[in-house]
Curated annotation (Swiss-Prot):
Keywords, comma-separated and alphabetical: 4Fe-4S, Iron, Iron-sulfur, Metal-binding
Residues reported to bind [4Fe-4S] cluster 1: 20, 56, 59, 62
Pfam families: Fe_hyd_lg_C
A GO biological process held by the record: iron-sulfur cluster assembly
Role, per record: Component of the cytosolic Fe/S protein assembly machinery. Required for maturation of extramitochondrial Fe/S proteins. May play a role in the transfer of pre-assembled Fe/S clusters to target apoproteins.
Protein name: Cytosolic Fe-S cluster assembly factor NAR1
Residues at which [4Fe-4S] cluster 2 binds: 168, 215, 394, 398
Record PANTHER family: NITRATE, FORMATE, IRON DEHYDROGENASE
């Protein structure tokens, strides 16, 4: 949430309705005529604060007055209290998962290489909290990507307009609350956070799952009705560091050369897999992986990259000289770009025409005899005309999540840090998604969200709103 909205002197009179981007309108009250005049008396009705979509996206997920209720189960202090109770009763084990963006952020913060950070983190969770499992999220991400690709292959031929990725809870909440027309175009495949949690709960149904994620919106994702049993608590790297401070712990004192990843991995899992990555963006590579999955059946094709008007918009096209544009996908990050995308997609009458036009335009360009390299110089990215869009609420994507350790940086340094982390991300060894999924995904779980339209709440009861989640 922006600093403006956190100011203590701000009158937080935003009704805690579920559509806070559309603040409740004050009811007009007719005043009875009076012959008495009061001087210097201010209105008894507090002035409502208007939150723009830019404030809402990539923050803490539409949270105002109900913040304490919504996040009552999602903080490092709650984790410490809960784990203390569980440890005394000795009823449950601890399972910890951490995303690659968080690992890179912590490695940068503690001036460690990624391998040292991973060993240090594993040792800390095992020694301090007696963790049974400590894993990365690549296993869950691989399954998420595979399920998304399979869904796209089924739905793209029949869908009018692009299909939208739903792994970013900030975008999902925005669509469910304010843009219900987008929901039919959104994929319901769960994120790596939830799939990892589901798999850990299968390995040990009694485990308490702590997930460390790059943004605060992931807390709200874990609070969804269909997700509650998969993740017990979500904290960010900022909160992880704050927890160490509360415990007066020197994290670097847990550095070790011993790799405990094998013994901290559930039985039957590839213990190396969790700490790897995959080709594509530092937000998960969903857009790129879709085309990569199709390229295997089109051996003479190439994937070309088309830059957008800014660095947060990128389009990919799978092309060949014989077939033209075979498929397309795009990445759209940040409020302004999401707003532009939604504006185009909301024009439902022209969505189908745009879907046809993009392929015809692509084919005509390639059939003119130009090479793929030359073609990219004359094309402009247009996500609204692609088959699939990887949407992330944070500018620069998940590598710039609000929960990462970059709060003290100014705008330029923050952007540079995101670029540095993205570069470091590309150096993480990549895995082949089809190989992983073939070996480990038994297809017995659907791993799906229950996407739905969220109607604005008419209740002013904060507790009632919190219970809605």
């Amino acid at each position: 949430m922006s600093a403006l909205l956190r100011d203590a002197d701000l009158n937080d009179f935003i009704s805690p309705g579920l559509a806070c981007v559309k603040p409740a309108q004050p009811q007009k009250v007719e005043k009875k005529p009076s012959f008495e005049v009061e001087v210097g008396i201010e209105s008894s009705e507090p002035e409502k604060v208007s939150i723009s979509l830019q404030d809402c996206l990539a923050c803490a997920g539409c949270i105002t007055s109900s913040e304490e209720i919504l996040l009552s189960k999602q903080s490092h202090k709650v984790f410490l209290e809960k784990w203390s109770e569980l440890e005394e009763l000795d009823e449950r084990s601890l399972a910890v998962s951490i995303s690659p963006q968080c690992r890179l952020s912590l490695a940068d913060y503690y001036s460690m290489c990624l391998a040292d950070l991973d060993r240090c983190f594993q040792n800390f969770m095992k020694t301090k909290f007696n963790a049974k499992y400590v894993v990365g999220t690549q296993f869950g991400r691989s399954i998420s990507i595979s399920r998304i690709n399979a869904t796209l292959k089924d739905r793209v031929p029949e869908n009018e307009g692009p299909l939208l990725c739903s792994v970013c809870p900030g975008f999902v909440l925005y669509a469910e609350k304010t843009k219900p027309e987008l929901i039919p175009h959104m994929l319901d495949v769960k994120s790596p956070q939830q799939i990892t949690g589901n798999l850990l709960k299968q390995a040990d149904p009694t485990c308490y799952h702590l997930s460390i994620m790059p943004c605060f919106d992931k807390k709200l994702e874990a609070s969804r009705e269909e997700c509650e049993k998969e993740v017990d608590c979500v904290i960010t790297p900022k909160e992880f560091v704050a927890m160490l401070g509360d415990l007066s712990i020197d994290f670097k004192s847990y550095m070790t050369e011993y790799d405990s990843s094998k013994e901290l991995c559930p039985s039957g899992w590839d213990y190396k897999l969790h700490w790897l990555s995959n080709e594509g963006s530092s937000s998960g590579g969903y857009a790129y992986q879709y085309l990569l999955s199709l390229q295997s059946s089109n051996p003479e094709s190439d994937i070309i990259t088309i830059e957008g008007k800014n660095s947060d918009v990128t389009e990919y096209r799978l092309v060949s000289k014989s077939k033209g544009v075979i498929a397309s996908s795009s990445e759209v990050y940040g409020f302004r770009n999401i707003q532009n995308l939604v504006r185009k997609l909301s024009q439902s009458a022209s969505v189908k025409k745009r879907g046809i036009k993009v392929k015809r335009r692509g084919q005509s360009v390639l059939k003119s005899g130009e090479t793929s390299e030359k073609t990219t110089k004359v094309l402009t990215a247009d996500p609204a005309k692609t088959d699939f869009v990887e949407v992330m609420a944070c500018p620069s994507g998940c590598i710039n999540g609000g929960g990462l350790l970059n709060e003290e940086k100014n705008a330029n340094r923050r952007k540079q840090l995101a670029q540095d982390l993205s570069l470091a991300y590309t150096k993480v060894h990549s895995v082949n998604i089809p190989d992983i999924v073939h070996a480990y995904d038994d297809k017995s779980n659907d791993f799906k969200y229950n996407l739905r339209v969220i109607e604005p709440s008419t209740s002013s009861d904060v507790v009632a709103v919190g219970n809605t989640w």
